[in-house]
Amino acid sequence: MPNPFRILGYGVAMLTSIQLMAAMPSTAPVAPTKPYVVKSEHGDRQDPYYWLRDDKRQAPEVLAYLNAENQYYQQYADHYKTLNKTLADEIIGRVKQDDSTVPAIKGDYSYYTRYEQGKEYPIYARKPKAGGAEQVMLDVNSLAQGKDFYQIGNFQVSPNQQLLAYAEDTSGRRNYNLKVRDLRTGKDLPSVITGAAASLAWSADNNQLFYIEKDPQTLLGTKVRRHTLGQDVTKDELLYEEKDSSFYMGVGNSADDQYVVVWLESTVSNEMLVLKSDDKSGKFTSIAPRQRDFKYEVEHIDNRWVIMTDWDAPNYRLMTVKDDQIGDRSRWQPLLAHNPDVFIDSFQLFTDYLVINERSNGLDRVRLMPWSDLSKARYVESDEAAYVAKTDNNPEQNSQWFRYRYTSLTTPSSVYEMHMKTGEKRLLKEQEVLGGFDKNNYQTERVWATAQDGTKIPVSLLYKKGLKKDGTAPLYQYAYGSYGISSAPSFRSTVISLVDRGFVYAIAHIRGGQEMGRAWYENGKLLNKVNTFTDFIDVTDYLVTEKYAAKDKVFAMGGSAGGLLMGAIANMAPEKYSGLVAHVPFVDVVTTMLDESIPLTTNEFDEWGNPKQKAYYDYMLSYSPYDQLKKQAYPAMLVTTGLHDSQVQYFEPAKWVAKLRTIKTDQQPLLFRTNMEAGHGGKSGRFSRMIEIADEYAFILSLLPASPKS
């Protein structure tokens, strides 16, 4: 039986953009201009909207402008609020609200996360492995009460499983408070550590907590401290201080809990420091000293370290070193050779098996090998055109079973476990999707678009079966393409609302990610960054030419560095897109990278370039969306940000929108929404995030041209 709400949504969606423009508020907010010069040794630039930057987020004039933009957005969105509600009901209606994860066994307990009907936040709980009543460790719904934003960034149970250390964010800026809860009483200990990163590690005696202290201005982790329970936090020991501001920092326990591991990482190099978890000295030892263009990751088992490294291996290889030989990489022994056609992404260690997450021809798979003979491999892969297979949480190294997660654009996330010796496989849980979803109604496909330089770009597609490739379907195209982060073709229940309305959903695996190996990333960063943008445009052209999509119904979305992508294509090829959605976009590239007081800037010189060097300054300026705005027609655009975003500061998109309003020559809607309580990831509750997605989809659907059937 047809869903009446879905039909209603489709009818409302067919309002023409002309009708909506006629109903729009007559005037958009106009930000005043104020003289300001951004100085650089390579030239000065006028920035009349620089005043929109307020690091304290309190300036009345700035808040008034952001609120005016929010009001303008809301007035526009009110004209399709029925559609918006329909979409929100659909998206939320697919969620099994009282759901829980597959329990993970560690020590004497099985740990899991669950949600309750109608509740925004998770509940972290456990049960005795031998059987018994549930113990709620953290009810985030209770912790979040009365707060505009609340998020648990991390938690770690002590080795004796009696204490829980957890990191909470109450602003959205990823500046955490660290607390310790006594699981025997359910009460938090009195000491609270503030201004910390989310990463944590325990000492073997359950009495000390290792954590990262952040710089209050840049929000970079700079110091490793050790807190003794019951002691005043002002007396916490400083164990290590990082002087190089291009390095990120984190801390955790090795998988076997034998070591505390500090990782220091920049774009092109890293270093890992280790300390026995029962060592009171606090003196860390380096696995191998840092060196430019040399990276490695480590894990510990059976008195040795297994190392994944790019040393003479762009796609990584595995090596090993004994505990008493660390510090000198000439002592490393080969374990698994480099393969130029297979990228090693990560690995897990078991007593009898080595398990690797790897990527071949752009697709993820899992490889299992017995330590007794690493030439004997068993694979977890699929015959679906585009999919993801990766290891899941496996806390017990001595297990004979390992868990992995499988998903595709048509298959909801599924957790399996496999017996490593026999290959026996069993499904533990498949994400339940409500609302009448049937994966057999959908088709996934992998196609290859040709870039301007002849490179073949993989594209993952999702559409409803029966799609006529006649050039009439609307397209919703997504990509990220930075930091070597690969865009996985995983299941998204939200996008079904567009696919059910005839959309083709495309993930463009453009350069700057790492889908096709390390070279794929190298060819989409620094002085090759423009490849990211032209790849995306070339994918659009391919999908239109091959009649997957109508040229007047192409929509695109990206966030953060993907928001930079949206800003770049808006300048480079505005005529190819009917609408763009840019979430928390990084659009003022040069000004941000010149300012080392802004969080993340110094860490990312090897991603974007250091504008103090003229070659990088000129290149970044050539694509920076804010600097390259010009008098031309632009697509309809929805831009979002969070006032407390620490990754991409709110003033970047605010300035961009303010300038764009004065320079664009079209009458298409330009909407800007600031979440006044959120950070980089948007609102913290699960339903709040779904409602924001419904807002985005309603905006896109409202732009579709009228259909004779509407």
Regions found by a protein language model. Give the residues of each.
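Mature N-terminal segment immediately following signal peptide/propeptide cleavage
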Residues: 27-80, 88
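Non-catalytic accessory segments flanking enzyme active sites
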Residues: 61-156, 167, 247-300, 334, ...
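Hydrophobic beta-strand positions that form the internal "hydrophobic ladder"
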Residues: 110, 161-164, 209, 260, ...
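Beta-propeller blade signature
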Residues: 126-128, 179-182, 223-231, 274-277, ...
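Asp-box/WD-like beta-propeller blade repeats and closely related beta-sheet repeat scaffolds
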Residues: 134-154, 165-218, 222-225, 235, ...
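Cap/lid segment of the alpha/beta-hydrolase catalytic domain
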Residues: 141-158, 166-173, 184-189, 418-424, ...
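Blade-edge beta-strand/turn elements of extracellular beta-propeller
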Residues: 183-194, 231-243, 278-288, 326-337, ...
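Active-site-proximal cap/loop segments of hydrolase catalytic domains
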Residues: 507-710
